[in-house]
């Protein structure tokens, strides 16, 4: 395994700047960089260590010799305070992601959940900056979602940020057999407030989601969607449709001998086996 060094910097415009942590392997193999984008309510720390102090994906990738970047999305964690967090849109995050890729060069984007849309839109508008996309239970493009009505219980008021409840966390995030349940409190206190507008855009409330319209723009970009069998909001059919829409590959973890995974694959027991899975897939596509 390689050693690595860590450096930090920011990209983007105030107040929507984005914190970036760079893991540079030694020796640096000059590999295609891998950018890890976290999901809603999280920060980049979810890729550093697990709640029970096991090695996270960012450190593992760097030790294998891959240049790895993790971020705190604008308005999250070390990126700093955003006065209108409740009203912050997906486009702010996409802009910051593009700014990062313009600085470091074309990269693999690994997305999780909410940031799935960021990956699709970044590839749509700047396809030459995206070498491949690995979507971990990614949010689908709005093209695959019905327009939610304003009166739905899934619509969130945009006069305040969203706070993830303990009940919903246990129901949707940490329910799996492979999550380290004895360390739930360590995980729960790491969660942060989230933009209500982004949550509504994700659900395509009143047709406000972000559409691709021409998925063929992404056909030349290798895409892989990876989903576990214990993820309540990402059943097989939903994530398989996302992969098919982009003519990508779909990995259902039980089918490759990895059952019992939920929404937080990077934190669950067996997380490094999943990392090996997408690393091997990237190799098979000639990306890294």
Please provide the spans of the model-predicted regions:
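N-terminal cap/lid segment of alpha/beta-hydrolase-fold proteins
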Residues: 1-27
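Short, surface-exposed "cap/lid" segments of acyl-processing enzymes
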Residues: 28-30, 34-70
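Short beta-to-alpha linker loops that shape the active-site pocket of alpha/beta-hydrolase fold enzymes
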Residues: 40, 67, 72-77, 139, ...
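Glycine-rich "HGGG/HGxG" loop immediately N-terminal to the catalytic nucleophile
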Residues: 71-87, 259-260
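Conserved acidic catalytic loop of the alpha/beta-hydrolase fold
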Residues: 91-108
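Conserved hydrolase catalytic core segment
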Residues: 105-144
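Alpha/beta-hydrolase
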Residues: 144-241, 248-249
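Catalytic active-site module of serine/aspartate enzymes centered on a nucleophile-bearing elbow/loop
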Residues: 252-288
